[in-house]
């Protein structure tokens, strides 16, 4: 793709590798930008080329720390002050998405706050993938293009996992809709893990609803953080007679001790996308790229085409 659509792609520190792959897919260079860090921990953003009147796409996942969010906000502000025409935030992993509602008294709703900050900074569109809660799209007053990791996962599953003995499973009731979509499109049964938590990242009890005896189980989730839920679900599947257990999840948050838990679990394979950089070496982890998916979304936004056909479900 040539650059006749008058657009430029830039990247924050956290997502540079993915942004480079997106640009390779688009056939355009990654835009030149400088992020200067100071001794006191502050940083400043400046564009090293003119973006006046251009449509800019700023690629940055807001994980693993608030610095990445602040960096993105400064990128947006600098683009607005440099007279960019349209400013699209491309956020492969939208951090704080698990703070999407008031589930107890006197608690913040982080996802809404982040949406307000991005909008106030000056974005005119958001492209993201597999939000933890679909309703977060409604927190924005600008268009939101919500992509799905299933677009790349389904191709991998069909090529590498025999469907005749496959069962799709969700590690918690909240993921039932997602797992049901996979089961429906693959034409296979679904089972559910029901869990109760003592507190965040700490599971009290888990049980299976459904039959996995002598089946190859595919656990489906959106985020793996400490990997406590996904590995406990895998172990439970094996205890209940599953022949093998693999898992897919869009976002590899993988906070310690997640990698160790995955390696020591009964999981045969753990498959993520590259929405978040995953630098650790874990023999069971496989990474699928979503660069082509985001590149196609950017291309269609620039040419005012529908992106609905990019959705697998």
UniProtKB/Swiss-Prot annotation:
Superkingdom of this protein's organism: Bacteria
List of catalytic residues: 195
Entry keywords, A to Z: ATP-binding, Cytoplasm, Kinase, Magnesium, Metal-binding, Nucleotide biosynthesis, Nucleotide-binding, Transferase
Pathway the protein contributes to: Metabolic intermediate biosynthesis; 5-phospho-alpha-D-ribose 1-diphosphate biosynthesis; 5-phospho-alpha-D-ribose 1-diphosphate from D-ribose 5-phosphate (route I): step 1/1
Binding site for ATP: 40-42, 98-99
GO biological process terms on file: 5-phosphoribose 1-diphosphate biosynthetic process; purine nucleotide biosynthetic process; ribonucleoside monophosphate biosynthetic process
Catalytic activity annotation: D-ribose 5-phosphate + ATP = 5-phospho-alpha-D-ribose 1-diphosphate + AMP + H(+)
A Pfam family per the record: Pribosyltran_N
Class of this enzyme: transferase
Cofactor(s) it depends on: Mg(2+)
Protein residues bound to D-ribose 5-phosphate: 197, 221, 225-229
Segment forming the signal sequence: none
Localisation: Cytoplasm
GO terms for MF: ATP binding; kinase activity; magnesium ion binding; ribose phosphate diphosphokinase activity
Entries under HAMAP family matching the protein: RibP_PPkinase_B (MF_00583_B)
NCBIfam families, A to Z: PRK01259.1 (NF002320), ribP_PPkin (TIGR01251)
Record's function text: Involved in the biosynthesis of the central metabolite phospho-alpha-D-ribosyl-1-pyrophosphate (PRPP) via the transfer of pyrophosphoryl group from ATP to 1-hydroxyl of ribose-5-phosphate (Rib-5-P).
Subunit structure, interactors included: Homohexamer.
Similarity-based family: Belongs to the ribose-phosphate pyrophosphokinase family. Class I subfamily.
Name used for this protein in its record: Ribose-phosphate pyrophosphokinase
Species: Porphyromonas gingivalis (strain ATCC BAA-308 / W83)
Phylogenetic placement of the source organism: Bacteria, Pseudomonadati, Bacteroidota, Bacteroidia, Bacteroidales
């Amino acid at each position: 793709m040539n650059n006749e659509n008058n657009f430029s792609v830039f990247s924050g520190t956290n997502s540079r590798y993915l942004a480079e792959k997106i640009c390779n897919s688009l056939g355009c260079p990654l835009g030149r930008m400088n992020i200067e860090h100071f001794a006191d921990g502050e940083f400043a953003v400046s564009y090293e080329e003119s973006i006046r009147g251009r449509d800019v796409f700023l690629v940055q996942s807001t994980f693993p720390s608030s610095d990445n969010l602040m960096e993105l906000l400064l990128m947006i502000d600098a683009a607005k002050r440099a007279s960019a025409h349209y400013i699209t935030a491309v956020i492969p992993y939208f951090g704080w998405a698990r703070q999407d509602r008031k589930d107890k008294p006197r608690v913040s709703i982080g996802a809404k706050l982040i949406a307000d900050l991005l909008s106030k900074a000056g974005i005119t569109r958001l492209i993201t993938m597999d939000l933890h809660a679909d309703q977060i799209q409604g927190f924005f007053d600008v268009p939101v293009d919500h992509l799905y990791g299933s677009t790349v996962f389904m191709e991998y599953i069909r090529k590498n996992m025999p469907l005749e003995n496959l069962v799709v499973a969700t590690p918690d009731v909240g993921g039932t809709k997602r797992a049901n979509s996979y089961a429906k499109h693959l034409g296979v049964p679904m089972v559910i893990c029901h869990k109760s938590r003592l507190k965040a990242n700490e599971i009290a009890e888990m049980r299976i609803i459904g039959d996995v005896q002598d089946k190859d189980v595919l656990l489906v989730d959106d985020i793996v953080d400490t990997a406590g839920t996904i590995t406990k679900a895998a172990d439970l599947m094996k205890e209940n007679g599953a022949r093998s257990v693999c898992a897919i999840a869009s976002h590899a948050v993988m906070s310690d001790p997640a990698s160790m838990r995955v390696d020591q679990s009964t999981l045969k394979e753990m498959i993520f996308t590259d929405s978040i950089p995953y630098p650790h070496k874990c023999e069971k982890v496989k990474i699928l790229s979503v660069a082509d998916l985001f590149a196609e979304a950017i291309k269609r936004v620039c040419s005012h085409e529908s992106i609905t056909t990019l959705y697998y479900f």
